[in-house]
A protein has these predicted regions:
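Beta-propeller fold detector
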Residues: 55-60, 96-100, 154-157, 196-204, ...
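Beta-propeller domains
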Residues: 34-59
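Short loop/turn segments immediately following beta-strands, especially the blade-tip
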Residues: 188-195, 281-288
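Residue-level marker for isolated small/hydroxyl-bearing positions within beta-strands
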Residues: 37, 79, 124, 177, ...
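Blade/loop signatures of beta-propeller domains
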Residues: 1-11, 41, 137, 195-196, ...
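A short loop-to-beta-strand structural motif that recurs across blades of beta-propeller domains
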Residues: 43-45, 85-87, 141-144, 184-186, ...
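Short, solvent-exposed loop/turn segments at conserved positions within beta-propeller repeat blades
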Residues: 39-40, 81-82, 128-140, 179-183, ...
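Beta-rich, blade/repeat-based domains predominating
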Residues: 12, 17-33, 60-80, 85, ...
């Protein structure tokens, strides 16, 4: 029988770098770099992995940069939750706004983003927490897709606070964490056109059930075997490919998001409040972008 410990070479996290305010959006690049956003400080950084030091500020005044992914052309794409938009960092250093409105209404607070195998981008736009009443325009929380032609498609609006998201190994299921007010792991089937159907709750994730650490479901990733990892109350919650709960790996700080990296894609990077931690895994993560 598979255990949660069999997925980690060690369940003790290794501190990579610290000194931030609120870390998010870990994204690995093969040039020995980890991109990390400090959401509250409004700064986006490069961390040099071998030296375990911050080597460069790539954007100061980052719009609350949160989830990040490389697009089909290898450009960095960021959800800027405070600026309420999704942007792409161009090779020349300029920034292109991919989307900031659905129709004539501004997005809520774009949160996390992933790349579909066809090159389109799926992202969550959760509820309006943090917005003044007068700034609320959409009236619902959403999961969107940015098509290759730039069109924005509404995929789902039946969750209260969709947050992290990830595709199953076969691409036929999209898993999404719901943060509040009913924290849980959610799932949709993905049809051949990339639309979402068969909305269902996989598992409830109650608030702060692990001693002094609280928190909500947040970042989400899967590995090549189909195991599901969600940052949540007290640590990283794990389910196997059959959606059976395996347990929780605790961290010194409350985690917010997860990223895969390393040449074998077997390193898990975890952003957790003031720090970034790593685990070495026994299965590679998906997708492998490089």
């Amino acid at each position: 029988m598979k255990t949660i410990k069999s997925l980690f070479t060690s369940t003790k996290p290794e501190l990579l770098v610290t000194g931030f305010v609120f870390t998010e959006g870990p994204l690995w690049h093969p040039d020995d770099i980890l991109y990390v956003s400090d959401v509250d400080a409004q700064v986006h950084y490069k961390v040099r992995l071998e030296q375990k030091v911050i080597t460069e500020v790539i954007r100061d005044g980052s719009g609350g940069a949160n989830g990040a992914v490389f697009d089909k052309d290898g450009c960095l794409v960021i959800c800027e939750q405070d600026a309420r938009r999704v942007v792409r960092y161009e090779p020349d250093g300029s920034i292109t706004v991919l989307v900031d409105k659905y129709g004539d209404k501004r997005l809520n607070r774009s949160n996390d983003i992933i790349l579909h195998p066809d090159g389109s981008l799926y992202f969550t736009d959760p509820d309006k927490k943090g917005l003044e009443e007068s700034d609320k325009e959409l009236g619902f929380a959403s999961i969107f897709r940015i098509n290759l032609d730039g069109d924005l498609v509404l995929l789902a609006k039946d969750m209260n606070h969709p947050n992290g998201l990830g595709f199953s190994v076969d691409g036929k299921t999209l898993y999404v964490s719901n943060s509040r007010p009913d924290p849980h792991l959610h799932a949709y089937s993905v049809d051949n056109s990339g639309m979402l159907n068969d909305s269902r709750i996989v598992a409830e994730m109650p608030y702060g059930n692990l001693g002094e650490l609280s928190g909500v479901p947040d970042g989400l990733k899967l590995d090549a075997e189909g195991n599901i990892y969600v940052t949540g109350p007290g640590g990283i919650w794990v389910w196997d490919k059959y959606e059976e709960f395996l347990g929780v790996i605790e961290l010194p700080e409350l985690p917010a998001n997860i990223g895969w990296g390393g040449t074998d894609n077997c390193t898990m990077f975890v952003t957790a409040r003031t720090s970034v931690y790593t685990f070495k895994m026994t299965r590679p993560g998906i997708p492998k972008q490089f």
